[in-house]
């Protein structure tokens, strides 16, 4: 069985194509969204999702989140004395989703179509694929998030040619894509984005407003108090979309700090973020050679697009109401599930050709002559420019720059800077050329880039026909099949908590967190209910556990209100 997975910065989802069409698969807690949070305790137990999120309130050093931002890098996260790479943490999310899907579907899940941001470069895509492999999933196909959203909205079934812009503002990343449908082909025309802009930034604005109004300083708060502040700011951010003002409260020791924040104040403080949002929109339109008026439809995906401050801004910007038929949190996962069905050649799904673009420019280092006989080295020569539809193959002819030069070195680079040193080095190829006066020998440098992110570099000496090729599959941190297998064995000691224990652990963690926040009689009441629940867990009698859990849940919900 092939499933579709939206591996998000803030939340992740799994979906499958069933007889009823694409459906979101609920996790073991019965919810569609699984927070992309992982916690590992000192005994090697892994907690994923809400349970890990609750542990962050109590054991912040054992929890990692937003690690999608570091995919494809060498960064490691230290959880309870154990080090993990971003793809290893992502694999734990994927394992969790895989288990839930198998229980829901009643069959083994062997493969997944995983969504990635359109601007993810080769390193990040390879890291995502490795995460799937570490989770025991075959990942042959990845789909860009905007394309997945367009598929979910059914735009590929439209009868007429259409241009549309997909606006994806998630918890931690921002992505703008312009797509065009013509003759049953869904083509990505341009992408732009910001890897460090998302709903979390709008939460930070709310947090800063609260600190300003209460005279508090973030650095003076303990780590647990900072976590509580963020949680309260997140709740206020969501609440203010439906109100003209919200009241934030934060218990610090025995003092309850309170501040009222109006919608007008919040909108004014968000102005800088909205201006940052505008830039990728302008860039994507410019790269596609289009104006705002050329866009037929605007689609919203990502949970942060629910914010009224964001939606109002977009209505003013595009002078039209965006399409909001689908749940913005679920559209990408549903599209990935439809793509999985296409891969399986399911007859219920109309086949459509999905094209993607090269997110970053690929080129090489060259020497340029800026005056007669004066040269400057270290310059960047683009060969396949960003937002070129892939698969693509382009050739540049380059010449020798010195008399009696007998070798040409082709350094393969990725980036947008004029200077080679500022771009990402991918590989290098050297080839012999006949000696002669400078400029007398030429080489054809051909880059071929396919939809699976494989880059083939071919260098051909024009005079002799000598040809050399190299294929760039990944970067220095690419793992071999043997290394992946070895790491899977090393990670096998980490056990995701059994499904039937998840709800009990989550309730207990919530209760412990609220106990720490409470005072006086409220704290005593919580202690009494927690003790009863813990006693029921020790006895192991299902009916007693359910009764005690329900009673504890009731007072926890009263506290949350």
What annotation goes with each model-predicted range?
Residues 1-73, 77-83, 92, 99-561:
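Oxyanion-binding/catalytic loops of NTP- or PPi-dependent enzymes
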């Amino acid at each position: 069985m092939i499933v579709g997975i939206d591996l998000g910065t803030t939340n992740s989802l799994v979906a499958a194509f069933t007889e009823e069409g694409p459906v979101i698969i609920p996790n073991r807690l019965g919810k569609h969204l699984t927070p992309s949070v992982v916690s590992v305790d000192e005994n090697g137990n892994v907690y994923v999702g809400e349970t890990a999120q609750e542990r962050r309130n109590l054991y912040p050093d054992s929890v990692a989140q937003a690690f999608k931002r570091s995919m494809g890098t060498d960064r490691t996260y230290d959880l309870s004395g154990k080090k993990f790479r971003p793809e290893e943490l992502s694999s734990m999310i994927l394992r969790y989703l895989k288990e839930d899907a198998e229980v829901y579907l009643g069959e083994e899940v062997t493969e997944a179509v995983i969504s990635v941001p359109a601007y993810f470069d080769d390193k990040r895509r390879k890291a995502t694929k490795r995460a799937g492999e570490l989770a025991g999933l075959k990942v042959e196909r990845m789909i860009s998030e905007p394309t997945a959203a367009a598929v979910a909205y059914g735009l590929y079934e439209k009868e007429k040619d259409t241009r549309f812009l997909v606006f994806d503002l998630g918890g931690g990343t921002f992505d703008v894509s312009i797509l065009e449908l013509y003759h049953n082909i869904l083509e990505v025309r341009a992408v732009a984005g910001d890897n460090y802009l998302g709903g979390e930034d709008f939460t930070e604005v709310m947090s800063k407003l609260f600190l300003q109004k209460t005279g508090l300083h973030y650095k003076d708060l303990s780590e647990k108090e900072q976590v509580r502040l963020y949680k309260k700011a997140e709740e206020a951010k969501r609440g203010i979309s439906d109100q003209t003002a919200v009241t934030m409260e934060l218990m610090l020791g025995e003092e309850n700090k309170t501040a009222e924040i109006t919608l007008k104040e919040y909108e004014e403080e968000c102005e800088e973020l909205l201006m940052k949002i505008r830039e990728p929109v302008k860039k994507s339109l410019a790269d596609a050679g289009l104006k705002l008026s050329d866009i037929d439809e605007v689609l919203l995906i990502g949970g942060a697009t629910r914010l009224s401050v964001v939606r109002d801004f977009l209505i003013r910007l595009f002078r039209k109401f965006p399409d909001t038929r689908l749940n913005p949190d679920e559209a990408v996962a549903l599209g990935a599930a439809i793509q999985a069905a296409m891969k399986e050649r399911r007859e219920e799904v109309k086949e459509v050709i999905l094209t993607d673009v090269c997110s970053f420019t690929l080129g090489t280092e060259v020497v340029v002559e800026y005056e007669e006989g004066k040269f400057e080295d270290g310059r960047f020569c683009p060969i396949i420019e960003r937002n070129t539809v892939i698969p693509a193959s382009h050739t540049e002819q380059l010449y020798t720059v010195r008399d009696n030069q007998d070798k040409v070195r082709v350094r393969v680079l990725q980036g947008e800077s004029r200077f080679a040193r500022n771009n990402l080095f991918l590989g290098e190829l050297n080839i012999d050329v006949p000696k002669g006066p400078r400029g007398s020998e030429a080489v054809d440098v051909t880059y071929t880039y396919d939809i699976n992110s494989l880059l083939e570099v071919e260098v051909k000496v024009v005079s002799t026909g000598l040809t050399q090729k190299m294929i760039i599959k990944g970067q220095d941190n690419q793992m071999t099949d043997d290394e992946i297998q070895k790491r899977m064995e090393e990670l096998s000691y980490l056990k995701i908590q059994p499904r039937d224990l998840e709800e009990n652990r989550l309730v207990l963690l919530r209760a412990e967190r609220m106990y720490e926040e409470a005072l006086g009689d409220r704290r005593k009441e919580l202690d009494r209910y927690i003790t009863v629940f813990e006693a029921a867990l020790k006895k192991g009698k299902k009916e007693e556990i359910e009764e005690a859990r329900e009673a504890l849940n009731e007072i926890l919900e009263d506290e949350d209100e």
